[in-house]
Amino acid sequence: MEKINKLKKILKSENIDGYIVPKNDEFFGEYIPDYKDRLKYISNFTGSYGFALILTNQNFLFVDGRYTLQAHKQCGNLFKIKTIPNELPGDILKNKKLKIGFDPNLFTSRTMNIFFSKTNCKFIPLNYNLIDKIWKRKENKQKKKFYILPNNSASERYQSKINKIIFEMRKNKAEFFFISASENNAWLLNIRGNDSKYTPIPHSYILIDKMKNINFFCDLQKIPSSFKKNFDKIKFINVNNIKNILSKITRKKFIIDGSTCSFFFENIISENNKIINNQDPIYFLKSIKTKNEIENIKKAHIYDGAALTKYLFWIKNNFEKKKITEISAAQKLFNFRKKNKNFKFLSFPTISGSGPNGAIIHYKATKTSNRRLNKGEI
């Protein structure tokens, strides 16, 4: 409650009536590092999706059906829990005329339109994040390098992929394409990173023009020396310079994807340029798998299926003899998986729930919720 009260004091000093706190960070991935989890900080909610609407006199937490039970358990005392799409912010704000602030780096214009367009409220993009004013965040200073995919894993050479992007740009008569989805940048250049706990993505943005000039924006400490040799025609630029570079481009035609391009970047680009708001063509291009990719997908399923089969056999033969808990069971499955030499990490936290915990969608066992596996329970 102390954190919320501090935030509400800031609302008063900013002369606004409310503030929206999303789960995501500026890269809009499903999983974010702890030091960027502002929603968890202000609400205690640990699910992978949701946002808080904090008004001067009420607090609301919006989640989807996966997390309704979890949200009530974790923060039902301080927040009114609302389940999307049954209840939307527009329903609460319908007859109000409030000034509500938000961080434009953490929202897309599409998200704002979906959730907040049907109100009489004024939504104000702020130049700073209000949660950061009360939270002394400790950023992870360990910078793990990006890396290039081995040839037997890449679908095709990155130069060929860029030609396909240029074709899409010419088709739309666009002079620039701003790629804001990190996973699409990874596909385009055949690279990977360590910026998400469960997905090997390199947090980045790409700006490509019709002459194939490419600017790659990221934390430069993550760029290995091998990149300069392999990507000699690509400029690697500190992500802090992106606003300055985009602001200097005028009277051009840009392709952006409104589902991944932040409100902040869309505003900068649209101020002096014409925008074509299309779905990023990379989503379609990367959905077409080569024979090699299909074979690798099959192998991954076989390897993981073998680990899961060994785990189920172990559970069947040991759960009555030994004390097996939700956490120890999840650890055992992890141990079976990591025996494979190609194993990198999990694709999401293992959902290991027994008895009543099994009813919680996307449940993640903790020291306080951890239960023993008992006979007769699912």
Give residue spans per PLM region.
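Conserved catalytic alpha/beta cores of large enzymes that bind or transform nucleotide phosphates
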Residues: 98, 102, 226-281, 286
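Conserved short loop/turn motifs at secondary-structure junctions
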Residues: 101-107, 153-154, 184, 281-285, ...
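N-terminal accessory/capping or targeting/presequence segment of soluble
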Residues: 1-94, 107, 111-248, 307, ...
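Loop/turn positions that initiate beta-strands
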Residues: 376-378
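Amphipathic alpha-helical
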Residues: 18-22, 326-348
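Generic, well-ordered alpha-helical scaffold segments in large soluble proteins
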Residues: 7-10, 14, 96, 118, ...
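Terminal amphipathic helices with adjacent charged low-complexity linkers/tails
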Residues: 119-140, 261-296
